[in-house]
Amino acid sequence: MKTLRFPAGLYGITPEWDDTDRLLAAVRAAAAGGMTALQLRRKLADERLRAAQARALAPLCRELGVVFLVNDHWKLALDVGADGAHLGRDDADPATVRAQAGAGLLLGVSCYNDLRRADALLAAGADYVAFGTVFASPTKPEAVHAPLQTLTEARARVLACPAPRPAVVAIGGITPANVSQVAQAGADSAAVISGLFEAPDIQAAARACAAAFSVNP
């Protein structure tokens, strides 16, 4: 299998927690369970808190060996030394970000259920393409649905890319109970928010999610 630009496995997405100490402890627990990447996603926080949490998470993720990305705010990602940024449809243009940030910044992109969007963003150099929601999501209850077949079709596209190839990420309503479905459908990684960080045992939830990818490489 071609080497991936973005790590396979469990991709944690931060919940809307203002308590930074609680967040850092949860990230440690998730990493202990096998989380390979983390995205700071703070849609409701003010700029100061978002930046403070990014500055706290960047060195922690380096210590833990977890790839760290910032949602939307790619300049903040650069400022704190994050590994990458995640961009949605309404965020900065990925090609523009790539031109300004250089090849060293990982860029992940939301593709919803749109394979043609994925084709264009893969051509622009995206390091992963994310599809969802694959299951009903408590975080985005009104989001578009991306069926599991979308992951299978996306995988065929990324396998045609030169090595190291981009990854396929699934998001939306993923829990330890259903994560194996996205792995079997072709996702390299599962992005999980409440199914991880709202679990009664975060480390155990992380371990269960990570295991789905160890048996479905």
From Swiss-Prot:
What UniProt keywords apply to this chain's record, in alphabetical order?
Answer: Magnesium, Metal-binding, Thiamine biosynthesis, Transferase
Give the E.C. number(s). 2.5.1.3
Catalysis performed (reactions): 2-[(2R,5Z)-2-carboxy-4-methylthiazol-5(2H)-ylidene]ethyl phosphate + 4-amino-2-methyl-5-(diphosphooxymethyl)pyrimidine + 2 H(+) = thiamine phosphate + CO2 + diphosphate; 2-(2-carboxy-4-methylthiazol-5-yl)ethyl phosphate + 4-amino-2-methyl-5-(diphosphooxymethyl)pyrimidine + 2 H(+) = thiamine phosphate + CO2 + diphosphate; 4-methyl-5-(2-phosphooxyethyl)-thiazole + 4-amino-2-methyl-5-(diphosphooxymethyl)pyrimidine + H(+) = thiamine phosphate + diphosphate
According to its UniProt record, in which pathway does this protein act? Cofactor biosynthesis; thiamine diphosphate biosynthesis; thiamine phosphate from 4-amino-2-methyl-5-diphosphomethylpyrimidine and 4-methyl-5-(2-phosphoethyl)-thiazole: step 1/1
- Which GO CC terms are listed, alphabetically? cytoplasm
Q: What class of enzyme is it?
A: transferase
Listed under GO biological process in this entry are: thiamine biosynthetic process; thiamine diphosphate biosynthetic process
Listed Gene3D superfamilies: Aldolase class I
Required co-factors: Mg(2+)
Binding-site positions, Mg(2+)? D72, D91
* Residues the entry annotates as binding 2-[(2R,5Z)-2-carboxy-4-methylthiazol-5(2H)-ylidene]ethyl phosphate: S137, P138, T139, G173, I193, S194
Quote the record's cofactor note. Binds 1 Mg(2+) ion per subunit.
- Quote the record's binding site residues for 4-amino-2-methyl-5-(diphosphooxymethyl)pyrimidine: Q39, L40, R41, R42, K43, N71, S110, K140
Record InterPro entries = Aldolase_TIM, ThiamineP_synth_sf, ThiamineP_synth_TenI, TMP_synthase
UniProt entry tagged with the keyword Transcription: no
- MF terms per GO, please? magnesium ion binding; thiamine-phosphate diphosphorylase activity
What this chain does, per the entry, is described as:
Condenses 4-methyl-5-(beta-hydroxyethyl)thiazole monophosphate (THZ-P) and 2-methyl-4-amino-5-hydroxymethyl pyrimidine pyrophosphate (HMP-PP) to form thiamine monophosphate (TMP).
The record's similarity note reads: Belongs to the thiamine-phosphate synthase family.
Q: What is this protein called?
A: Thiamine-phosphate synthase
Gene source species: Bordetella pertussis (strain Tohama I / ATCC BAA-589 / NCTC 13251)
